[in-house]
Amino acid sequence: MKPLHYTASALALGLALMGNAQAVTTIPFWHSMEGELGKEVDSLAQRFNAENPDYKIVPTYKGNYEQNLSAGIAAFRTGNAPAILQVYEVGTATMMASKAIKPVYDVFKEAGIQFDESQFVPTVSGYYSDSKTGHLLSQPFNSSTPVLYYNKDAFKKAGLDPEQPPKTWQDLADYSAKLKASGIKCGYASGWQGWIQLENFSAWNGLPFASKNNGFDGTDAVLEFNKPEQVKHIAMLEEMNKKGDFSYVGRKDESTEKFYNGDCAMTTASSGSLANIREYAKFNYGVGMMPYDADAKDAPQNAIIGGASLWVMQGKDKETYTGVAKFLDFLAKPENAAEWHQKTGYLPITKAAYDLTREQGFYEKNPGADTATRQMLNKPPLPFTKGLRLGNMPQIRVIVDEELESVWTGKKTPQQALDTAVERGNQLLRRFEKSTKS
């Protein structure tokens, strides 16, 4: 009979080996997807975890995009950052300039996982790539463009063709007046006013938002959205607001709820709002392209993306990064990227996901579901319509919101408000430029 202490030692060793064999690498993933979108994020994570028992993706909703970005950077400074942080597109320059990130192409390379960067739609991947090397710094995830949602039932009641949404902003103003006259509470409201009414208005109508090709060619860019075309557009919305044909309902996505609960007959909002509209709208609705300015030469041009990408944070161990690479690879697989696109309304981020969705007949069964993609690919992007890469852009958006609100409340003229927004925004750009050179 073996001595008892040998048996106990063997038992302890066995338990330790079992523990190691069953060890699971936990990978925190902080995001800003709520409602139906949050459910889809959870579903993707659960499926990955089931297929990869050595890893556990733990998605956590950390508030809206601004709140999540702030929480992620603050957590990095205290050594408690998540492995994956979802950051909205205007936070790209900030993340690039920070020392908090590990480029995704490095993550894949070190994990020994083949990663084809060319699989992503160029208009999307170009937004998140290093302008010097061309390599992806973050992985595209929930990319979107603004679209026009409209209530077909309300259109019929107002004597409008439910299959013909307004094509121009001038048409939209006319439609909204008719909808109001028919008894609808709100003819038109807009979500994300800075992104839609200035950033995308500029690109869609072939206008620069800032110099240096919207910042892609250097941090010394200056804002240029106070030109006559943009001022005229804001003045049109101001006039609609005075008549009650445009309702300002908030800075974020508040207009989506106003739309699906039947208060507003039309809204311009993210294509990613489709999941919630599909779930909650109790009426027939349509999806149209963003209106363009009837007076703009060669409009419409191409939409620029919104949404967010996934950034990998510094300071994690090798096993965590291997799990991160596996998860990002999982998200990019055609069947997963196509499902995310189809269920949420976000763009198909890879060519294969778009092809698979088309082959499955999804667009035929769901008219309008490809609207965001068609807008993005409407024309080859001009150097100043491929996106924005401006430092401190989240803070600049706040300034734009404040100044536009001063128009809606009658405190400033459109020219005064946009001039002030440009002046205040340029101060932030110079501050960012200085910080990148120090």
UniProtKB/Swiss-Prot annotation:
Gene Ontology cellular-component annotations: outer membrane-bounded periplasmic space
Subunit structure and binding partners: The complex is composed of two ATP-binding proteins (UgpC), two transmembrane proteins (UgpA and UgpE) and a solute-binding protein (UgpB).
Disulfide feature: none
Keyword Nuclease appears in the UniProt entry: no
Source organism of this protein record: Shigella flexneri serotype 5b (strain 8401)
Cross-referenced CDD domains: PBP2_UgpB (cd14748)
Binding site for sn-glycerol 3-phosphate: 65, 89, 144, 270, 307, 346, 397
Keywords: Periplasm, Signal, Transport
Protein name: sn-glycerol-3-phosphate-binding periplasmic protein UgpB
Annotated GO biological process: transmembrane transport
PROSITE patterns: SBP_BACTERIAL_1 (PS01037)
Predominant location category: periplasm
SUPFAM superfamilies according to UniProt: Periplasmic binding protein-like II (SSF53850)
